[in-house]
UniProtKB/Swiss-Prot annotation:
HAMAP family: DXP_synth (MF_00315). This is 1-deoxy-D-xylulose-5-phosphate synthase. It comes from the Bacteria. InterPro entries: Dxylulose-5-P_synthase, THDP-binding, Transketo_C/PFOR_II, Transketolase-like_Pyr-bd, Transketolase_BS, Transketolase_C, Transketolase_CS. It comes from Nitrosomonas eutropha (strain DSM 101675 / C91 / Nm57). The lineage of its organism: Bacteria, Pseudomonadati, Pseudomonadota, Betaproteobacteria, Nitrosomonadales. Pathway: Metabolic intermediate biosynthesis; 1-deoxy-D-xylulose 5-phosphate biosynthesis; 1-deoxy-D-xylulose 5-phosphate from D-glyceraldehyde 3-phosphate and pyruvate: step 1/1. Catalyzes the acyloin condensation reaction between C atoms 2 and 3 of pyruvate and glyceraldehyde 3-phosphate to yield 1-deoxy-D-xylulose-5-phosphate (DXP). One of its GO terms (biological process) is isopentenyl diphosphate biosynthetic process, methylerythritol 4-phosphate pathway. The gene is dxs.
C-alpha cells in the first residue's frame, strides 16, 4: 500500500531515494497521515501542509546531526513518521504513546521540545552559536509559522541572530497567503538566484568594495532593497541581517530541494519564506482548516461530523456570558492572544466585532493592552489558557496588579488537559496567581457557578481571575439571571463528622462522591484568594482531619493557602493536601490522569483512610 514509505525507517534511508521518487513518497505519506489521524485524533490540517517541507529537510540535511527545531510542534507528525515512529502513530497522544509535539526524550531527531509558540528561532540560534564555539560544521534550522512569527519573542531572536552572524536558517511556513502563477514563477527564479553561491559571493564582494565609501555602500544597499522589495516582502528580514529568499511554493519539491541545497552551502543567517496550504491533499481540511486543526476520530471518506454536546463546555459558558454581559455593558471588550475558537470567542467576535481584539500570539502584549484599556475606563476581559498566561507573568504583576486595574482574566484549560500533555496543562495558575497582591482568584465548581463568578469578577474594580477546566461540568442547570457570588466565601455542601474535604473548583464533584462513603463534611471553597479564613477556622475546630483537594500543583497551591491560614492562627490540626505532584504529567485520558493522581472518588477515599490509619 505504501511501497516507498514502507522502505523508510530513518532519514538516512530517505536519502537513498531518487529525487524523482519524492513526489510519490509525499503522496504516500499524506495518505498514511490521514488514515492514522482518523483513527487516533490529533492535529491534521497543519500536518498536511508540511509534508513536502519535511521530506525536503530530511533529504537535504544530515539529521539528526543537523538540528531541526519545529516551532509549536503540532505539525511534526510527518517528521515523526520519517524518524522511526511510524508504528507509534497508532498510540499518538495517548497514555504511554508518542507525544503530539517534539520531545527530546522521545527521539534524537527531536532536537528541541516545543509546544508553545515562537521559541524555535531562539533555540536554533543557541544551537548555531554552540556549533561555532565547538568548531563543528552543523546546520541549525528553525521552522516557524506565520502566526508564531507575530510574537515578540520571534523578533527578539531575529534581531539577535543578525548581530551574531550565526549559521542559522529560519524557514517561515506561511499558510496565510497565496501566490498567483506569474508572481510565483518569478519568485521561484529569484529564490534560486538569491540562494545560490554566485549571488551571495557577489553581494559580499560588493559590500567589501563599497565599504571604503560608506555613502556609496548605503546607496547601493537601498537600491538593492528597493528592487527586491518590488517583488519580495523580505526587506524587513534583510534589515535584521538575514539573506531573504522567497516566497516559494512549499509544496513544490523540486524548488524546495534546489533552494535548500543552495542555502546549505551558504554562511551566515538565512531566511527562507515558503507558502503552504493547510489541509493540503485532503479536500475537507483544505476547505475548513480550522475545523480540521485538531480533530477526534473520524472516517476519512465522510470527514469530521461535529457531534452535538449534551451539555455545554465551560468554554461555551464563558462565550455565552461574554455576549450577554456585552449587551448590558458597553465598556466590555474581549481580548484573546490568537485563540478565538479555543477560548469560545467566535460568537462574540461576530456580534461585537468592534469590541473584539485578537492581538495575535502575543500574550505579553494582550495583558498590557488590557491594562491600558482599563486605565481609560473600559472593562477588559482577557480570555486565555492557563498555560499561556504564564508567558505574561511580568505584565500581570507590573502592568495590572501593581496598578490595581480592573482586568478580568478568564482562564481556560485549568488543571489537566489530557492528550496535549505537560506543555499545555494548567497545573500552576493557583500557585503563581495567589502570591500576587490585589488579585482575586476564584474557581467554579459547576456550570452555573462559572457564569455567576464571571459576572462577579466583572463587577469588581480590581484584577480578578476565574479559572475553569477543559471540557464539560457535572451538568448543573445554568441560571440566566446573573448574581453576585459572596466575595471570599465558601459554602458547606455536605455536613459530616470527623473529616472535612475542602474542595477547590472542579474537585467538588469527586469530593461529594467520596464524602458519602467517608461521612465527611464537604466544602465548596470557591475562592483561593481571598480565602474564607473564618470557614477554615470553623472547620478546624469541628473536625479531626482537614483535606484540601485541588487540580493544581500542591506546591504553593490552594492547600498551601489553607496551611498558611492555620499556621498564622497557631492552629495545630492534621492536614492532608491532595493535588498534582511535583512532576510533569504525560498525556493521557483526562479521567485516567485524575485517577492516577488520586483525585477521583477512589483516590480521595484511599488517601484519607491511609492518613487516618497513621
Amino acid at each position: 500500500m505504501y511501497p516507498l514509505l514502507d522502505r523508510i525507517e530513518i532519514p538516512a534511508q530517505l536519502r537513498n531515494l531518487k529525487r524523482s521518487q519524492l513526489p510519490q513518497l509525499a503522496d504516500e505519506l499524506r495518505s498514511f497521515l490521514i488514515e492514522s489521524v482518523a483513527k487516533t485524533g490529533g492535529h491534521l490540517s497543519s500536518n498536511l501542509g508540511t509534508i513536502e517541507l519535511t521530506i525536503a529537510l530530511h533529504y537535504i540535511f544530515d539529521t539528526p546531526f543537523d538540528r531541526l527545531v519545529w516551532d509549536v510542534g503540532h505539525q511534526t507528525y510527518a517528521h515523526k513518521i520519517l524518524t522511526g515512529r511510524r508504528t507509534g502513530m497508532a498510540h499518538l497522544r495517548m497514555q504511554g504513546g508518542i507525544a503530539g509535539f517534539p520531545r527530546r526524550d522521545e527521539s534524537e531527531y527531536d532536537a528541541f521540545g516545543t509546544a508553545h509558540s515562537s521559541t524555535s528561532i531562539s533555540a536554533a540560534l543557541g544551537m548555531a552559536v554552540a556549533a561555532r564555539i565547538n568548531k563543528i560544521k552543523q546546520h541549525a534550522i528553525a521552522i516557524i509559522g506565520d502566526g508564531a512569527m507575530s510574537a515578540g519573542m520571534a523578533f527578539e531572536a531575529l534581531n539577535n541572530a543578525g548581530v551574531m552572524d550565526a549559521d542559522l536558517l529560519v524557514i517561515l511556513n506561511d499558510n496565510d497567503m497565496s501566490i498567483s502563477p506569474p508572481v510565483g514563477a518569478l519568485n521561484h527564479y529569484l529564490a534560486k538566484l538569491m540562494s545560490g553561491r554566485f549571488y551571495a559571493t557577489a553581494r559580499r564582494a560588493g559590500e567589501r568594495m563599497l565599504g571604503v565609501v560608506p555613502p556609496v555602500l548605503e546607496l547601493a544597499k537601498r537600491a538593492e532593497e528597493h528592487v527586491k522589495g518590488m517583488v519580495t516582502p523580505g526587506t524587513l528580514f534583510e534589515e535584521f541581517g538575514f539573506n531573504y529568499i522567497g516566497p516559494i511554493d512549499g509544496h513544490d519539491l523540486d524548488i524546495l530541494l534546489t533552494t535548500l541545497n543552495n542555502i546549505k552551502q551558504l554562511d551566515g543567517p538565512q531566511f527562507l519564506h515558503i507558502v503552504t496550504r493547510k489541509g493540503k491533499g485532503y479536500k475537507p481540511a483544505e476547505e475548513d482548516p480550522v475545523l480540521y486543526h485538531g480533530v477526534g476520530k473520524f472516517e476519512p471518506g465522510k470527514g469530521v461530523i461535529p457531534k452535538p454536546s449534551t451539555r455545554p463546555a465551560y468554554t461555551q459558558i464563558f462565550g455565552d456570558w461574554l455576549c450577554d454581559m456585552a449587551a448590558k455593558d458597553s465598556r466590555l471588550i474581549g481580548i484573546t492572544p490568537a485563540m478565538r475558537e479555543g477560548s469560545g470567542l467566535i460568537r462574540f467576535s461576530k456580534e461585537y466585532p468592534d469590541r473584539y481584539f485578537d492581538v495575535g500570539i502575543a500574550e505579553q502584549h494582550a495583558v498590557t493592552f488590557a491594562a491600558g484599556a482599563a486605565c481609560e475606563g473600559l472593562k477588559p476581559v482577557v480570555a486565555i489558557y492557563s498555560t499561556f498566561l504564564q508567558r505574561a507573568y511580568d505584565q500581570l504583576i507590573h502592568d495590572v496588579a501593581i496598578q490595581n486595574l480592573p482586568v478580568v482574566f478568564a482562564i481556560d484549560r485549568a488543571g489537566l488537559v489530557g492528550a496535549d500533555g505537560p506543555t499545555h496543562a494548567g497545573s500552576f495558575d493557583l500557585s503563581y496567581l495567589r502570591c500576587i497582591p490585589n488579585i482575586t482568584v476564584m474557581m467554579p465548581a459547576d456550570e452555573n457557578e462559572c457564569r455567576q463568578m464571571l459576572y462577579t469578577a466583572f463587577q469588581l474594580d480590581t484584577p480578578t481571575a476565574v479559572r475553569y477546566p477543559r471540557g464539560t461540568g457535572p451538568g448543573v442547570q445554568i441560571k440566566q439571571e446573573m448574581q453576585i457570588v459572596p466575595l471570599g466565601k465558601g459554602e458547606i455542601r455536605r455536613q459530616g463528622t470527623r473529616i472535612a474535604l475542602l474542595a477547590f473548583g472542579s474537585m467538588l464533584s469527586p469530593c461529594l462522591e467520596a464524602g458519602d462513603e467517608l461521612d465527611a463534611t464537604v466544602v465548596n471553597m470557591r475562592f483561593v484568594k481571598p480565602l474564607d479564613q473564618e470557614l477554615v477556622m470553623t472547620l478546624a475546630a469541628e473536625h479531626e482531619l482537614l483535606v484540601t483537594v485541588e487540580e493544581n500543583t500542591i506546591m504553593g497551591g490552594a492547600g498551601s493557602a489553607v496551611l498558611e491560614c492555620l499556621a498564622s492562627q497557631g492552629v495545630n490540626i492534621r492536614l492532608l493536601q491532595l493535588g498534582l505532584s511535583d512532576n510533569f504529567l504525560d498525556q493521557g485520558d483526562p479521567a485516567q490522569m485524575l485517577s492516577d493522581c488520586g483525585l477521583d472518588k477512589t483516590g480521595i477515599i484511599k488517601s484519607v483512610k491511609e492518613r487516618l490509619s497513621l
